[in-house]
A protein has these predicted regions:
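Aromatic "clamp/platform" in nucleotide-sugar-dependent glycosyltransferases that forms part
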Residues: 293
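Conserved acidic donor-binding segment of nucleotide-sugar-dependent glycosyltransferases
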Residues: 325-326, 330-337, 346-351
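Carbohydrate-associated surface elements
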Residues: 168, 189
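Conserved donor-binding/catalytic core segment of Leloir-type glycosyltransferases
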Residues: 208-227, 233-237
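Acceptor-binding helix/loop patch of EC 2.4 sugar-transfer enzymes
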Residues: 56-69, 110-150, 193
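A short, well-ordered alpha-helix in the C-terminal region of glycosyltransferases
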Residues: 346, 353-368, 374-377
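Short hydrophobic beta-strand element within catalytic cores of glycosyltransferases
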Residues: 310-313
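Nucleotide-activated donor-binding/catalytic signature segment of Leloir-type glycosyltransferases, i.e.
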Residues: 256-279
Length: 395
């Protein structure tokens, strides 16, 4: 497995080691992130840490200036480091982020099968959606594809299989020419050690307090154009609900600061909360809303469900596929403040229903969405394609 960063792999890679299917893990993280932190023997991990420090140094000194060409250089640097420690395997599983072409070429040279994992929709679809959104917000000119995104598109077409966290992502790549029959969808999981339901006593207390405490809507996401915060703000402005509050947790991008200024006083903002500390914010809220324009999955939806919240999110968010509308959440169209307002008001007027939907979300998360379950499905996929590949070679 190779990933130029950490992303979600640290949540389940220990299960691959336990099952005996992991040969080596190439990644890029700070020096403090060692094999023992991942549940792996040091002999199986290769950390291209210099890339990670170079990226952070560039961001500190230059910000966004020359980001694309320098990151492309850093990515190639990481790949060459990985190749110096290469070990042939039956399957290369790698995250598609425009930084794998050398590794994919080497894997094919070795006769290995290659699984590429895109975490967002195809770059062309993503560009179209974001260009429309930038124009709508009036915050910047049209975005053009950069070399890293073009590399991602090219890499996808050289993979034997794609692994997607949602059907939304799978359909996007299929529209752009990748064989639909070679795309496997496995929804991502949630760490149930950190994100857990309320205790029975807490739940009873929350039920008793329904009529006396404020109704809280929470959104946890970076505040960037892609996440669609303005549609939630417009919905909130329409509703004017008494004894209610809107909480945003997430860093604000420079491009969104002037946009948010138009809604000053309408919401409470916390710039950063460590992931393992989010539970208390979820558990003291009533509804989770994520109005994304595009989101390949959105782990925060699964986290909120595991903590007992009904979820309102858009059809362009992969995690929407987890929802049973009316039972544990609602799906709404993108860019529809009216639809968001309608669902929020429904739960505001029926707070007992919101509590019951949150309980249903809890049960689903606990039964179906642990990372151990994800790893089981992934290992089954590895074995399936290896068996198919072996038969093809024999014939």
């Amino acid at each position: 497995m190779a990933v130029c960063g950490r992303f979600h792999y640290h949540n389940y890679i220990r299960f691959l080691e336990t099952a005996g299917v992991l040969n080596r893990f190439h990644y890029a993280a700070r020096l403090s992130v060692k094999g023992k932190n991942l549940g792996l023997p040091e002999t199986k991990v290769v950390n291209g840490f210099l890339k990670e420090y170079a990226v952070h140094l560039h961001a500190r000194l230059l910000g966004e200036r020359w980001r694309v060409p320098t990151h492309a250089f850093f990515h190639d640097w990481w790949q060459r480091h990985a190749l110096r420690h290469w070990s042939r395997a039956n399957i290369l599983h790698t995250m598609l982020h425009g930084n794998n072409r050398l590794l994919i070429a080497r894997a094919h040279q070795d006769g290995s099968l290659v699984i590429g994992e895109p975490v967002n929709s195809h770059p062309d679809d993503l560009h179209n959606l974001l260009n429309e959104e930038h124009q709508h917000l009036g915050i910047s000119s049209r975005r053009e594809a950069d070399c890293i995104e073009q590399r991602l598109s090219d890499e996808a077409l050289t993979c034997d299989y794609l692994l997607a966290g949602s059907q939304f992502v799978a359909d996007s790549f299929a529209r752009h020419g990748f064989p639909a029959g070679k795309i496997q969808v496995i929804p991502y999981g949630v760490d149930l050690r950190y994100f857990s339901p309320l205790t029975d006593a807490d739940r009873q207390g929350k039920a008793r307090d329904l009529k006396v405490r404020k109704f809280r809507v929470i959104c946890v996401a970076q505040i960037v154009p892609r996440k669609g915060h303005t549609y939630l703000l417009e919905a909130w402005k329409q509703l004017k609900l008494p004894d209610a509050e809107l909480l945003f947790i997430g860093r604000v991008s420079d491009s969104m600061r002037p946009v948010l200024a138009r809604y000053e006083g309408l919401f409470t903002h916390i710039p950063h909360v460590p992931n393992h500390s989010l539970r208390k914010y979820y558990c003291t809220s009533d509804v989770f809303v994520l109005p994304s324009i595009e989101d390949g999955f959105a782990y925060v939806c699964a986290e909120a469900m595991a903590c007992g919240l009904p979820v309102i999110t858009t059809v362009n968010t992969g995690a929407a596929e987890l929802l049973d509308p009316g039972t544990d959440g609602y799906k709404v169209p993108i860019r529809s403040a009216t639809a968001i307002a309608e669902k929020i008001e429904l739960l505001y007027r029926n707070r007992q229903q919101a509590l019951e939907m949150g309980c249903a979300a809890e049960l689903k998360a606990r039964a179906e969405m642990g990372w151990d379950r994800y790893a089981d499905r992934l290992i089954a996929f590895y074995r399936q394609i290896f068996k198919v590949g072996s038969h093809q070679k024999e014939s």
